[in-house]
């Protein structure tokens, strides 16, 4: 039984064409197959191109009916995808496979890749950067949004973030984008005034964000991961 982070998956379906910059191979497999499971709720079939073998234990994310509608291959060569409804690619490096896919008009396209040298070549795709926040917890980052998921085995589980903690992250992000950095003590004072919280509450929120890997503390200064 897979618990799907529905908010993020629904957002990805709305965006349709997304690149995930993620160096985490196992995470890419589990999340990619969980995304395929979500897409197969309304698509007849999906093509998945994965450069390495997928363990049967990970394929257990899908039921028998879903597996029959998921076409898996290590390469796009000799595969007719001109009429494909959806494609998921899990790559360990930049290869011609990806650029061939980009030339085809595919409605739902999701690519997992560790890095991209030529981001301008994929200007029509939304880019999410995936960062490991703490053990089993990953962040999906864009300039505007930040999602959290937890992977346990083959399960993708929602990670809820307290509202005040989310506000702390937003405030720190705005300050860093404007000034570059801020002392931890100054940020606590700022949050006390801006959010009308007691000092102890602000300190606890900052510590919580640090423990989750959302905020980094170094030399008395705070930065985002």
Task: Name every feature range the model reports, one short phrase each.
Residues 21-25, 48-53, 88-95, 112-115:
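Structural motif
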Residues 210-220:
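A short, conserved structural fragment
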Residues 196-210:
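Short amphipathic alpha-helical interaction segments
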Residues 3-7, 51-98:
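A short, well-structured beta->alpha microelement
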Residues 1-43, 48-50:
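Glycine-rich P-loop/Walker A and Walker A-like loops and their local beta1-loop-alpha1 context
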Residues 222-225:
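Flexible loop/N-cap segments at domain edges
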Residues 160-192:
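Short amphipathic alpha-helical interface segments
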